[in-house]
Amino acid sequence: MSIRPDRHETTKNPADEAAVRDLYRQLMDGWNRGSGEAFAAVFTEDGDLVAFDGTRFKGRKEIAPFHQQLFDKWLKGSRLVGQVEDVRFLSPDVAVMHAVGGTVMPGKTEPSPERESIQTLVATRQGGEWRFAAFQNTRVRLMGNAAAFLAWTLTDSLWKAFRLNKKTTYE
């Protein structure tokens, strides 16, 4: 899946770029294992995650239990698929990455259009280790497709009606 056909490499440091790209693979692996802890482990201790609906999670201590609840209930058995579009280094220890991806629900082979997203991630290297300091997930809404827009509108309305409150206990 690719939103843009003009994918390109944007760094001259192949080892660092490979490490940042691998971090994204680890993020997907944590999701696909259904492990909130593994999913959150790729973030810095105080990393930010902004979900597709605008909900913000601060730090692994919020990211892990929320995602575990998703993996145990609403997204049980789902898979996260994605592809890195580009990596750009702002400094030797900070990189911005864009990726496209989506959630594949059980019994499906690819994400439905309303589950496709573009993601912006900021990776930082601290003590020789790369981690994500920020993750912004935005659903792709190609306005030229009326059916996809209608599906998104309905899905968004249902999500808002039944969305998890961030203050929910994670029991």
List each language-model region with its residue ranges:
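Short beta-strand edge/turn micro-motifs at domain boundaries
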Residues: 1-2, 116-148
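Short proline/glycine-enriched turn/loop segments at secondary-structure junctions
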Residues: 108-112
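A mature extracytoplasmic/lumenal domain signature
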Residues: 100-101, 136
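A solvent-exposed, acidic/Ser-Thr-rich amphipathic alpha-helical stretch
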Residues: 17-18, 36-93, 100, 114
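Glycine-rich beta-strand-turn "strand-cap" elements at beta-sheet edges
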Residues: 2, 83-90, 138, 164-167
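Outer-membrane beta-barrel domain signature
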Residues: 43, 49, 106, 143-144, ...
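Beta-strand elements of well-folded, non-transmembrane domains
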Residues: 103-107, 123
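Short, low-complexity N-terminal intrinsically disordered segments enriched in polar/charged residues
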Residues: 1-45, 153-171
